[in-house]
Amino acid sequence: IATEGKGRATIEEVYQQITSDLDKAITMLGNSGKRKHISHINEAVASGIKARVALVMEDWQTALDAANAAISKSGCSVGTGTAVTGGMNDATANNVMWAAEIIADQSGMYAGFFTHMDADQGKYGASARKQINKLLYAKLGTNDVRKKWWNPQDENNEKNGYQQEKFKFKDYAKWTGDYIFMRIEEMFLTAAEASCRLNDDKGARLMLNSLMQKRDEDYTCKKTGTALGKLTSDETGSLLEEIIIQRRIELWGEFGRIYDIRRLKQGFRRTADMGWPSSALIAGTDTEDPESYAWVLTIPQTEFDGNPNMDPSKDQNPIGDHK
C-alpha cells in the first residue's frame, strides 16, 4: 500500500515523534512479559534508547530517569573478567543488555564487524589497524583493566600507534562473534553525566565511581563542575570532563561517539603524533568546528524523487562547511 510522503518536519516535531514512540514502546514492552532472546528489545533496552535520545536533547532529568530505569529493569551488572577482556563478543555476558547472537551461517565473514576490527584474522583489520588516541590512552590508570584493550607493544602497530585488542572473534575458523548493541556500563555513564548536568555532583560521582571501581581499584573521583574545553584535548579538570573521558574509554569502538561530539559542541584535533598514520587523518574538513555542516548528511536524492512534498531547493541540508 502506497502512502504519500510528508513534507520535511522540524527538529522539534521529529523529537516529539521519537519520544512519543519510545514512551509508548516502554509501556507496551513493560506489559509484554519476559523477552525470548537477547536480540529482542525489552523495556530496559527501550529505556536505554530513551536515555540516548534524551542526552542529545539535553533533557538531563529524562536521561537520568531513563538510565536508572534501564539499570534497574535490565538484571545486568557492570562487567568484570572476560565480560570486559574476553573480546566483546559474547551476548550472554552479564553486562550485555542487547545484542545479536551470530552463528556460523550468518557471520558475514569478510563483511563483518570483527573482520573490520580484529587484526589477528589477517584481513581488513590487519591492513587498516584500529588505534586509540594516545592522549586518551594516557588517561588510563596503571591498574585499569581496560589497558588490555590496546597493545602499545604490538610490532605491527602503524606509526607507533596503539592497536585495539578490545574486539576479537569468538571463533576464527567460523568467523563468529556476537554483536553487542548496548551494555549496562553505558547507562551508568549516562546517569553520571545527567546527574552532573543537574548539579548533583555527589550523585554523579557515585555512579561514576561505581563503574570505575570495577575497572581500576585505585580509582576515586572527587572532581566537581561542568566546564568543558573548546576542543576535546583542552582540559578543564571538571567532573563532567572526567565523565566524558571515561565514556570515551569505556565505549571506545561501540556506541555513539559521533553523537557525543555533536551534542557536546567540542571540536577535535587529530594528528599523526596522537597515534594514527597520516593517510588515515581527516583532510579538508575543519574538525575543530563542531557546528560544521560537514558532519550532517544530505538527504538522498531518491527521497526528493519519490516524495512530491519535498523540495530540494528548500529542504536539502547544506553541503560542506556552509553555515
Map each language-model feature to its residues:
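Mobile gating loops/cap/lid regions near enzyme active sites that modulate substrate access
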Residues: 117-118
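Active-site core of glycosidic bond-cleaving carbohydrate-active enzymes
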Residues: 121-148
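Acidic/polar-rich alpha-helix caps and helix-coil junctions
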Residues: 1-114, 139-323
